[in-house]
């Protein structure tokens, strides 16, 4: 594009919160984990357009994050930040924080504060429990969240990795504690959306059509609460049993789920 703004690739990775520093960006590039427009990048100094499609692939063996789940959210941010999702400076809620993979990713991407909520107790990694930017809310049922539960301050970014419950049951509570204009980036787990009787062997949803139905079900419930869909992408890593999972980016007043975007997310995601 004539006149399009350009920047060094390493600097652009940092600007998009896909790398913590230019040195970290160089490590990602050297590991072959960065693609620009679908092509693997090899040089930090490569000039790229600031609108370019840049993706950092997850590395399941990378010990960087406190849990494997961090790579899942990192993949979602790689898809959504170029489309306008902002993490930096925001007060966030991590619903179903567990050991804190999502919380870890949010802090590295510049979140101001993270409220880490989980029904369990003592699971959050010590490095996060002892971080002044993290408020730990253990033994807390996400369905029962109120502003009082999270110290009276609404959040403007919600991320969620919840198991054994359809997302439609927790969406009202997440909306209740969100500020106007908040972004919700939630993992859709088809195995908890389609009903036990429709699961394949090992509890895995193998049908692409069923997985699409799961995403559509969550999007429809979100629409009832006034939330539209700004993005949908497959998680770069499957769930523990091999279930393919998806992220929905929701915001009040956003558009309806685009069927073409959903088809693309399913086609490009893990099989």
Predicted regions and their residues:
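A basic, amphipathic helix-loop patch mediating RNA/tRNA/ribosome contacts
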Residues: 1-52, 91
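Conserved class I S-adenosyl-L-methionine
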Residues: 86-98
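Short, glycine-/aromatic-enriched active-site segment of Class I SAM-dependent methyltransferases
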Residues: 190-207
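Conserved S-adenosyl-L-methionine
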Residues: 105-113
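Flexible, glycine-/basic-rich loop-and-beta segments that form/coincide
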Residues: 244, 249-271
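A short glycine-rich, Lys/Arg-flanked "PGG" loop and its adjoining helix->strand segment in the class I
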Residues: 168-185
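Glycine-rich SAM-binding Motif I of class I
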Residues: 100-101, 122
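S-adenosyl-L-methionine
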Residues: 115-165, 169
């Amino acid at each position: 594009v004539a006149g399009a703004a350009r920047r060094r690739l390493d600097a652009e990775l940092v600007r998009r919160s896909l790398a913590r520093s230019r040195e970290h960006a160089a490590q990602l590039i050297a590991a072959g984990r960065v693609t620009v427009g679908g092509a693997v990048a090899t040089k930090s100094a490569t000039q790229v357009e600031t609108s370019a499609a840049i993706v950092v692939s997850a590395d399941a063996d990378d010990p960087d994050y406190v849990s494997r789940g961090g790579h899942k959210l990192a993949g979602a941010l790689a898809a959504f930040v170029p489309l306008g999702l902002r993490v930096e400076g925001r007060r966030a809620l991590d619903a179903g924080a567990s050991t804190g993979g999502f919380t870890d990713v949010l802090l590295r991407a510049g979140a101001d504060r993270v409220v880490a909520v989980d029904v369990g107790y003592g699971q959050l990694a010590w490095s996060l429990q002892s971080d002044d930017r993290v408020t730990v809310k253990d033994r807390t049922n996400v369905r029962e969240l109120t502003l009082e539960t999270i110290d009276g301050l609404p959040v403007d970014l919600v991320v969620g990795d919840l198991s054994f419950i359809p997302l439609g049951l927790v969406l009202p509570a997440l909306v209740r504690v969100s500020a106007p204009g908040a972004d919700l980036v939630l993992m859709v787990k088809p195995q908890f959306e389609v009903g036990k009787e429709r699961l394949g062997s090992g509890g895995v949803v193998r049908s692409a059509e069923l997985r699409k139905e799961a995403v559509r079900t969550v999007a429809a419930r979100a629409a009832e609460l006034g939330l539209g869909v700004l993005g949908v992408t497959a998680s770069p890593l499957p769930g523990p049993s091999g279930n393919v999972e998806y992220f929905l980016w929701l915001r009040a007043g956003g558009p309806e789920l685009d069927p073409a975007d959903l088809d693309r997310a399913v086609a490009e995601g893990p099989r």
